[in-house]
Amino acid sequence: MIKLNLPVHSIAHARAGDKGDVSNISLIAYLESGWPIIEKLATKEKVLEIFKHMGATRVDRYKLPNLRALNFVIHSALGGGVNSSLRLDRHGKTLSSHLLHELKLPISKDLLPINSPYLKKFND
């Protein structure tokens, strides 16, 4: 089966929240078929590497299989938190978009939603 290295947003969506200098990002598979690859390959090590440039020091990962989701708790990623950060996005809401774009996974055509623009890449 052909697999392409695609951004995780091709098979999942995400939400971000914050508490102090800690961000949490939930990564949720669109389809049941996308859950196993997210569970297996979206590791805390990969997420830490994506956010290290922002000062992240540790990532904890929690599985929520009934929701087809992972929750990543990213420590020290918000520049001190909403009250002390000088960043434009002090709550870290855009971090979910950053994760969706930067985390690349080997995705097969059958994991994509039927309206995915990435389906064209498999026909090229």
Task: Please describe what each predicted stretch is.
Residues 1-124:
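Long, contiguous binding/interaction regions
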